[in-house]
């Protein structure tokens, strides 16, 4: 019985009018047709939606039995078997002019099978699908959206991502995850190849640097920029090892990864040790084919290989946000410095000078780093400065200060670029002979986003 509600009739008429306008553009498969009405109705695929609308149009034409309805059947015929039966026309559905066959079930199956093959040997449980459209497909879709005038469509790539994702999940047992995928499956429709982007692993921990003479991270040769030259012995590096490189090997092997990227909470000088509880860091593991790592075993292996040089502890899995947190968190740091004076100083005078250091210090960029740091004045606080050992020409002190304060220049004054300085207060030259970082604080446990 026809609806007595004029609004219902108007909506149905508007839907069929839009559908006819789309069909007049050329033969269109059920998926591409249904996708133009994707926001209407739930619990069905676009293919089912498109097939249902085509069936509704055939039934509507049967009811009307008019020239207009026969014209609608002719528009349907190239892509609807029921319309061809009504018209008495033989043949099969013509190729879809919009997707050029990319939305056909067998094509989606093929893409899913390729993805599952590419995922073999990669340890993961969560994935996301992303589609790269060819230029022609993008142009066809743009024409359809412009001329079809449907207000209820969704993009073709969204449907491909969803439908191929369902098939991958069914075939592999892995789960789609829009927010935190371990791999991203890239479908390249121009040539049909499938590429797997493995998301990084992030491991938080602390390191202790037990020897002097090497940097925190890989340092390209200043002369050749890393290409290799006489100065660096054709290694491309200023130093032959670093904290980064020392711990890299065991991590790359354990995760079957391509590389690592090291993110530290600041860095100590090359000639300084990092002692105490260690410095917070995050290692970004690049393209790990294994993710289920035993971090206790990894810690032990790193410490075994780096024995006497570097030691790591407190390894946990974290998410990407920890990189920014570790790099940007401002920690108070405690240093132990062995100082040498140009002339003997009195112990009480030294203690007095140390107490007067407490407070704010104005530091212009030190001469030794001016080639790689902006030339500006920084204001940092010294929270404590205490004498630990004293022998006239040498002293050992501990200094607790803000992150970013240059302790060597706090002692020497750097020709007046740091004020006040210990040398200025003593009216005597002073320099740091040995420097150790003995505490860096750390990211509060409440801020650490652990990944189980």
From Swiss-Prot:
Q: What is its EC number?
A: 5.4.99.25
Asked if the Swiss-Prot or TrEMBL record annotates the protein with the keyword Protein biosynthesis, the reply is: no
Pfam families from the entry? Pus10_C, Pus10_THUMP_arc
Q: Any signal peptide, and if so, which residues?
A: none
Record-annotated THUMP domain positions: 71-200
Tell me the PANTHER family matching this sequence.
TRNA PSEUDOURIDINE SYNTHASE PUS10
Q: Please write the reaction equations for the catalytic activity of this protein.
A: uridine(54) in tRNA = pseudouridine(54) in tRNA; uridine(55) in tRNA = pseudouridine(55) in tRNA
Similarity annotation: Belongs to the pseudouridine synthase Pus10 family.
GO BP: tRNA pseudouridine synthesis
Give the UniProt keywords, A-Z. Answer: Isomerase, RNA-binding, tRNA processing
Q: What is this protein called?
A: tRNA pseudouridine synthase Pus10
